[in-house]
Amino acid sequence: MSTYVFPDVAPEPVAPPRTAYLVASGDLRESANTAGWATQVELEHVVTAAFAEHGWDVVRANGVDPVTGHGFISSQRMGLEVFASIPPDAPLVVAEAVWQYSHHVLAGLRTHRGPVLTVANFAGDWPGLVGLLG
């Protein structure tokens, strides 16, 4: 007889009502992420304010890393870790203000069951829309 003990399965997180989760995929280059962070913060303020006007809260799925100084998801591994904490049926906002690599969030997006809204800035100096469409 086996003595193997199966691990407990953690319950899926559940989103509070009228709450959307926000993610932002970054670049592979930390210098690009650091340089574009202020523009990303501005975009996130606009998105959060628009949701608030309609009675919704927006929760950033991951915080700002004190070591890098930005809150971009900057690797596939990080993307998997961030998406593990997002309720799978929650509304999700993918907000992009700079160049980014979609593969950082692709695995999480593939398994996410809730609605997904993609938003980007349209500025000549920071190509969020180009990053989003690319």
Segments (PLM) and residue ranges:
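Metallocofactor- and cofactor-centric catalytic cores in central/energy metabolism, strongly enriched
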Residues: 1-134
